[in-house]
């Protein structure tokens, strides 16, 4: 099927220290207190996983699938149920991507990740239930610090929208979980989107919970997700809690 002239539902922004996908036409429906309810998630091994059994990382852009913690419903089904049942819901994904380098943007790892998320978003859009979820879904990823910054101490040329971070040598660390930089950018982007839409910004972002698999348990590779939730002062939930009904 031809898609010429068809606007993609999300716009991607690739910075040296951050990758984000924001809806082109975001939808905000406030609750009675003029608040948005934020449901936040990790991505890998929380919402999706590689198709290859027992694999930790995706081998290609299409090597992923939605997870099933419940035999009856996939993680995508649960995301759809959130936006179906909560009109004030906004879903945001925060993901550390230590294997992705965005300098240059044409790097193999960056291209693979961008294509992977594009396919992820396409899977949502192609589902008849996607029209509610897609305009309320935001995705943020923290890539790896490029070696050139570390070894040659070269100054990165930042786009105009983030020149204020030019002289911040810790910006790469600040956007990686458990630090809260990605959430800070999300707050800014929500406010900016409201201004573009000529909509009154929400009085408050009501963080319902943050869900991730890196909780410092015996078999977990990290505790970055649970520490991230603590720094945000947000309730933490394991994927098994959210996606098993």
Curated annotation (Swiss-Prot):
Dephosphorylate DNA's 3'-phosphate termini. Has a role in the repair of breaks in single-stranded DNA. Pfam families: PNK3P. It comes from the Eukaryota. It catalyses: a 3'end (2'-deoxyribonucleotide 3'-phosphate)-DNA + H2O = a 3'-end 2'-deoxyribonucleotide-DNA + phosphate. It comes from Saccharomyces mikatae (Yeast). Belongs to the DNA 3' phosphatase family. Keywords: DNA damage, DNA repair, Hydrolase, Nucleus. This is Polynucleotide 3'-phosphatase. Its main location: nucleus. The keyword DNA damage applies. One of its GO terms (cellular component) is nucleus. InterPro entries: HAD-like_sf, HAD_sf, PNK3P, Polynucleotide_phosphatase. It is found in: Nucleus.
